[in-house]
């Protein structure tokens, strides 16, 4: 099956439903996105939101965040989720490659992402695509 990746620009009912189905597969604690929250996310200048389709159905999503800082334009891949039934069929790769192309065309100096250690297949995918593990600590302040 062919995977098609598109940039999302409008919070349609289909997109809202897809996020409602996909987001819980990424995080049990993530609140559901309503139309207003999705619209705010899509309209933010730093974000490029991608969806992947197989046979017309949305089976994955990825958000690329690009921010200019004093050391240059930096990019991050966030909230990658592929529907459980579509994993292993190239969806994650197609989404990541699309984000890589956009970051490269914007002349981002770096493209970072994080992945949980237990997600071995995701780690292997990112390494196949050229990402390398950094010797870095990640800190988080919960609100």
Each language-model region and where it sits:
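Conserved acetyl-CoA-binding loop-helix of GNAT-fold acetyltransferases
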Residues: 82, 88-101, 124-128
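Conserved N-terminal entry element of GNAT/NAT acetyltransferase domains
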Residues: 1-13
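Conserved beta-strand in the GNAT
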Residues: 51, 57-66, 76, 81
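Conserved GNAT acetyl-CoA-binding A-motif
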Residues: 96, 103-115
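Conserved active-site alpha-helix within GNAT-family acetyltransferase domains
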Residues: 93, 109, 117-135, 140-141
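A conserved beta-turn-beta hairpin within the catalytic core of GNAT-like acetyltransferases
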Residues: 67-77, 87, 134
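A short helix-loop-beta-strand connector motif used in the catalytic cores of GNAT acetyltransferases and
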Residues: 40-51, 76
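Conserved GNAT-fold acetyl-CoA-binding loop/helix
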Residues: 10-40
């Amino acid at each position: 099956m062919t995977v098609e990746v598109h940039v999302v620009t409008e919070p349609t009912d289909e997109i809202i439903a897809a996020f409602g189905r996909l987001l819980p597969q990424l995080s049990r604690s993530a609140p559901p996105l309503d139309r207003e929250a999705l619209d705010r996310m899509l309209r933010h200048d730093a974000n490029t939101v991608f969806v992947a389709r197989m046979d017309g159905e949305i089976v994955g999503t990825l958000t690329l965040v690009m921010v200019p800082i004093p050391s240059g334009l930096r990019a991050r891949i966030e909230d990658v989720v592929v529907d459980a039934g579509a994993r292993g069929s190239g969806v994650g790769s197609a989404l990541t490659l699309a984000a890589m192309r956009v970051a490269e065309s914007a002349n981002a100096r770096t493209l970072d992402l994080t992945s949980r250690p237990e997600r071995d297949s995701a780690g292997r995918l990112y390494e196949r695509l050229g990402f390398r593990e950094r010797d870095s600590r990640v800190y988080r302040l919960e609100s």
